Amino acid sequence: MAMVVNQWQENISADPGSQLQMCSQEPGGTPGTPSGSTPGNDALSGDKIPNVDCMVCGDKSSGKHYGQFTCEGCKSFFKRSVRRNLSYTCRGNRDCPIDQHHRNQCQYCRLKKCLKVGMRREAVQRGRMSNSQSSPGQYLSNGSDPYNGQPYLSGFISLLLRAEPYPTSRYGAQCMQSNNLMGIENICELAARLLFSAVEWAKNIPFFPDLQLMDQVALLRMSWSELFVLNAAQCSMPLHVAPLLAAAGLHASPMSAERVVAFMDHIRVFQEQVEKLKALQVDTAEYSCLKSIVLFTSDAMGLSDVAHVESIQEKSQCALEEYVRNQYPNQPNRFGRLLLRLPSLRIVSSPVIEQLFFVRLVGKTPIETLLRDMLLSGSSYNWPYMPVQRDRPISIHYNENGP
């Protein structure tokens, strides 16, 4: 299978020292780190540092850091951005000049250039591991990392996991704490959280923000309802008929029995899709891959770079296949069963989800409008369409590395 290479060159061809090799992994030392070198400061031949300018800003380089020759300033900026999982926004057209005099003016474009010239996120994370903890195929740091202990996570999957805007265990507990019966307001708030988290997750994936804004909107417009169902299953969202009917606004005006029956049927279909995913006991890494496969679909209308979107989707599928093969060797059909669930997600149409969960919050405002506004704003949690109670903030942002 041909290797999928993204525009930041963090993935791979046939180089055995590369970080990610889809569906295969070379044995030996930690991928991406030359023998005898450390992840943060790559070993140089001899003791003399070559006279090379910083590949990011053009300042004097202090050596090779995280895969590329950079100055101390760009090295520190990149390390801080990756370790804290920071997300930036460009106020211009995402093509700001990055040089010695302008490098501090736009953090988004500076981080983008760091990645474009070849600095590697995974090298920062490997630098946090002790030599005794490092092992082939393990790219996640130990200690506070909530995904530690899963040795088959590829670098690609770890990027997807680190993009999650919430700690999975805490988020799941939050969904389950009122599992007996959730009120209308709780259901609407939880639905908003699921939508927010889907958008924030997409914005935090390194290769999604680099797409043109119209492509980002097109992808989310096409996939938001499927991402919503996946998030609902992932957090075991309680789905009781009575409050869902109330949330859909069916109590507000007289209705025919046929309309009630139709909505109850929609709720049943939604419940079935969630329960089938829960029955597979999909783990966090698998959910991240499935969401990436769903998000990066070339079926979205008006894409300017269909081939690039297809390559990311192929990479997501390959990463999932490799992970399942290694993590679940006794379940040879698991990968196929996971993929077969994806077409069924579209059975739950986006208008149905809007009516069931969002009509009380936004009225007739189209979800597509909300998605666009979320992408344009600095944070999806600053939602202008719903009053947020001060004592119960909607924000569930999680920074795994602390402030």
Swiss-Prot record:
Q: Which InterPro entries match?
A: NHR-like_dom_sf, Nucl_hrmn_rcpt_lig-bd, Nuclear_hormone_rcpt_NR2, Nuclear_hrmn_rcpt, Znf_hrmn_rcpt, Znf_NHR/GATA
User: Where is region (Disordered) located?
Assistant: 16-44
* DNA-binding span(s): 51-126
Which cellular components does GO assign to this protein? nucleus
Task: Please state where this protein is localized.
Answer: Nucleus
Organism domain of life: Eukaryota
In terms of SMART domains, this protein maps to: HOLI (SM00430), ZnF_C4 (SM00399)
A Pfam family of the record is: zf-C4
Protein function: Putative receptor that is required in photoreceptor cells precursors during eye development.
Fetch the PANTHER family from UniProt.
Answer: NUCLEAR HORMONE RECEPTOR
Listed name of the protein = Nuclear receptor subfamily 2 group F member 5
Q: State which gene encodes it.
A: nr2f5
